[in-house]
Amino acid sequence: MLLEQRLEFIDSLPTLPTITQRSLLALPEFSEKPEHDINKPTASVMPDTIDAFLPGVSQAIIDDVNLCKLVMQNAATKKYPEDAQLFEWYRYYVDGLSRLGWVTQNRNLQEITIKKVGLTMDQVALEMAAGLIGANAAQILAGVAKKAVEAVQKDPGAIKIFDTHKKLGTQAKFDVAPVWLDNGGQANMILNCISLDARESTRGILFWKSTKQSTTIKSGAVRTYLDTNIFSGLRASLYKRYSESGKKFIDDLPDF
């Protein structure tokens, strides 16, 4: 795809929702936080999404990853808003990220059953990652993902952002995505889209824990990386259009 076509795609994407003054007051104040130490793991929270960053990921890359995902999740949700449209939502989301420079293979969601009591959302994400990068590597990523989920659970402002689209008693869609750098310095990510029946939890998917012997989920997960050569030509346009409005939907958590 030509650079001009990618830029036209960015221009065609919908704007982020407008937050009312009342809602804005309920969101966390983006006060001064300690500067991110590149040698430590950290995390960010967005609606339905927790991005868990391993040591070595700079703040600039964190910002790039978060904004790409926020913009495309918003576009996919506006195009396919119904729970029953999850398959279409996922395909549009993955295809859109590829237009922003993420190199991945489009893969349909699949239904799988995990036979385990007491499952939490980060453990479900681990199951997805293990099939892509192997159990040992997935365990390393899982440690950071678990800390990320726990950090969000303890932060009322982060919970509010994560629960932006929460509807209790229904299917819940979420993404717990580990992010790390490859030897070329490019961001790699397990791109998740996981949907399951969250009626067991009265507080939503963030605090969900399975009580059944098995849990059936719809899941799509692919390993992907951000091609810096492509994204460098798109960054300015993406940030110009979405950086300011995106701040209301992204909260960078303190390092672990």
Annotated model-derived regions:
Residues 1-78, 87-91, 151, 155-256:
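C-terminal assembly and membrane-engagement modules of membrane-active proteins
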Residues 110-163:
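Membrane-inserting effector segments that mediate pore formation, membrane fusion
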Residues 84-98:
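Short, charged cytosolic
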Residues 79-86, 110:
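Alpha-helical rod/repeat scaffolding segments in eukaryotic adaptors/tethers
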Residues 99-111:
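Membrane-proximal, non-transmembrane alpha-helical segments
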Residues 4, 51, 64-67, 94, ...:
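Generic N-terminal initiation segments characterized by hydrophobic and/or small/turn-forming residues
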